C-alpha cells in the first residue's frame, strides 16, 4: 500500500 499521511 502507498498511503500519504498528513
Swiss-Prot record:
It comes from the Bacteria. GO terms for biological process: L-tryptophan biosynthetic process. The keyword DNA-binding applies. GO terms for molecular function: DNA binding. Keywords: Activator, Amino-acid biosynthesis, Aromatic amino acid biosynthesis, DNA-binding, Transcription, Transcription regulation, Tryptophan biosynthesis. Activates the expression of the trpBA genes encoding the two tryptophan synthase subunits. In the absence of the inducer (indoleglycerol phosphate), TrpI binds upstream of the trpAB operon, overlapping its own promoter region. This is HTH-type transcriptional regulator TrpI. The lineage of its organism: Bacteria, Pseudomonadati, Pseudomonadota, Gammaproteobacteria, Pseudomonadales.
Amino acid at each position: 500500500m502507498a498511503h500519504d499521511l498528513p
